[in-house]
Amino acid sequence: MSKWLALSIALVGMGSSAVAQDAPYPPVVTFAVFRNGENVGKHVITFQQKGDSRIVTVDADITVKAMGVKAYHYAHHSNEVWVGDQLQSLQATTEDNGRKFSVSAQRVGANLKVEHTSTGPVASAAYDGFQAPDVSRETLPASTMPTSLWNFRYAKQSTLLNTQYGIPSRVTVVQGSPELVQTAKGKVEATRYTYSGDLRMSLWYDSRGRWVKGTFAAFDGSTVEYVLQE
């Protein structure tokens, strides 16, 4: 999701297609987002079944203030369509402190056809506004998982579709041991997966394959933590 927050991710993974199809989540899952212990936003995932398709919507909104003044704002919205454990399409938009990104992905045969666009503020003596959109295209294997965090199969991948930038993110994932993780409703046992490479973070999944916690290191040295609220 963001360079500043090291959240250019929408990550996740699961152990089997059965888990993905069973979707071990309620219709709405909410995480509170903390930066160095201060609540700075929320991350909400909704699940809806339409026939054979599962629609997954992700909304994140993060605001960091300095001395009461907004210093940083990040907003992300994505819509995924799944049939079983196969991603059929993805639409995502992100605003990262004034810079805007959009990603569109469509399954075509054995591939994902991806188009990504970015625009950003431009300030100069001659012009103050937004630059013309920068449009690029990628073709990835259809098995590539998006970085949307909720899907446990994400933890089994070495290449992910970055849902902010629309490019492949290459990662190495190390599985830890089960541990107790604090949520808003108490502690749950979950396994930690530590990511390095293009994405640097830790994600925790419980025995049912549910995402229950995430931590990310921001470029300024702060720690961003996702705490499950359900």
What feature does the model see in each segment?
Residues 1-4:
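Positively charged n-region of N-terminal signal peptides that target proteins for export
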Residues 6-15:
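Bacterial N-terminal signal peptides
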Residues 16-20:
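Sec/Tat signal peptide C-region and signal peptidase I cleavage site
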Residues 24-26, 91-190:
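Solvent-exposed helix/loop surface patches that form functional interfaces
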Residues 76-78, 101-104, 171, 199-203, ...:
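A structural detector for short beta-strand units
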Residues 195, 202-206, 211-220:
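Short, exposed beta-strand-loop hairpins at the edges of beta-sheets
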